[in-house]
Amino acid sequence: MKYFIPIMLLLLTSFTTRENADLVIYNAKIYTVSDKMDIAEAMAVKNGKILAIGRNSDIKSHFEAVSVIDLKGKAVFPGFIDSHCHFFKYACMTKAMSNLKGSLSFSEVLKLLKVYHEKYRPTWLCGRGWDQNEWKPKNFPDNIELDKLYPHKPVMLIRVDGHAVLVNSEAIRRAGITEKNIKNPNEAIYNTKGQFTGVFLESAADVFKDLVPQQDRQHQQTLLLEAEKECFSMGLTSLGDAGLDKGSVLLLDSLLVTGALKMRINVMLDPTEENFKTFVAKGPVHKDRITIRSIKVYADGALGSRGACMLESYQDQPGNKGIMDVSVEKLRSICKLAYDHGFQVCTHAIGDSANRMVLKTYSEFLKGKNDLRWRIEHAQVVAKADVPLFGMYSIIPSVQATHATSDMYWVNERLGPLRSKDAYAYHELMMQNAWIPNGTDFPIEEINPLFTFYAAVSRQDQKGFPRGGFQPENALSREQALRSITIWAAKAAFEENAKGSLEAGKLADFVVLDSDIMTIPLSNVPQVKVFMTYSGGEAVFIR
């Protein structure tokens, strides 16, 4: 790491008078995240881009600006990038539901639901965030109590991972699903009499989500703006929004083009015929704040709901290997479409069976080293023999470090010691291509990218558990973790030439923190606060 880089503007020495800038910051510790990880003191910004970056004396002597800010030694970083999240669904679904996260029993879920119902009286009573792995015993709930409390109102409670729902009998009636006509019987949980308990997984769960009435456009816009404020307050300036339908993309596009929204969004399209005709057939779209060049596919479910597709049965449920959500033939057809039209494929794969299938299917098209940057989202459990395929075919593992520290309490009983030892192998995966993008997968995890940074380096929860870290051999260094939420995250979306580092000519997306995450005790990182967030040289958050 080189401390205090020389000024980064080729013709700067030729100026005899000071050049106008919109913004100058100085007396800062600016982590540029350049190739050499240079550190600077000051930066000049104009028209949303970085004019120059270097020493205090150089920047102040060569530039004058309307806004000049003395940061008094505070640490500055490139705007944080969440490579994989669900921004639109968080805003327009989760924020419009009862928040069930952190509930320690089903009784607590019912209490939270009651408060929400009495306050809002919705036509559909919905909540999100329950996790039976946090309860004692760790069993899936059933809908008996829901039927007693809400016999005539449909209720849908989405599990924390989004891959399972608990619904009451009224919701099942409205969906028209019975034990005899359900398309995939493995996507429902049954009682000892062979009847639905109310828990549905994967595509069966999606049936209920689709029945919930959507907010009107104006309400959606309000919710999106609220969610954007949250993201800016966490230092996020760019997001990868994973899995959007046509209507959601068009709404985001209209709001971003008009400037109502300012977040930079990399769209991953749902693999629907409507999206293929509307977007993919016309080729990639690159605008100032929205990029459309990726297709999101689900290969399997999640570990928490035992939907992740495994090569062998779950340790705690013999005979159950999870659910494969897409056939090889279907994935192959999507890959061909993407390949032919210059689109990136981003496939959710958590179990080792799903990861193997995706890796092998990708390899049919990639044929060795390449720069197509096809991604596997999550890559949580990968068979040892399959790990080298990431490097062999330049396949990018897009991971979420907090998944490891959220799942570590129960993953051993779910997978057994051998498989769990090789799970969440982020350092090993990073080494395959020498870089790795990171994200949060919010609302499944918390939005805060500093939690991602902390989990990636410490492999611990915020209480310091376990001592020494969960599988610490797969921890990232602080520099690697920082790159994973900045320049490597930008690279995962083909945007490393525009953002992800603070260098002359790049977008002036940056965040100012109240402490230096690169030098403070690691245990203090989760308490660090964002002081200011800038997007395109504009202050979008000030504490």
Can you name each region flagged by the protein language model?
Residues F15-Y26, Y31, D35-T278, V297-A354, ...:
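Divalent metal-binding segments
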Residues Y3, M8-A21:
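Bacterial Sec-dependent signal peptides at the C-terminal "C-region" and cleavage site
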Residues G79, N275-T278, D407-V411, N448, ...:
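Short, charged, surface-exposed secondary-structure boundary motifs
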Residues H86, I290-G307, S394-A404:
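Non-cysteine beta-strand/loop elements that form the S-adenosyl-L-methionine
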Residues C335-C346, S353-W374, H378, K384-P388, ...:
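His/Asp/Glu-enriched, well-ordered alpha-helical/loop segment
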Residues L255-G259, A281-I290, K369, F390-M392:
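Acidic (Asp/Glu)-rich catalytic clusters
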Residues E274-V285, V399:
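Substrate-binding cleft/loops of secretory-pathway carbohydrate-active enzymes
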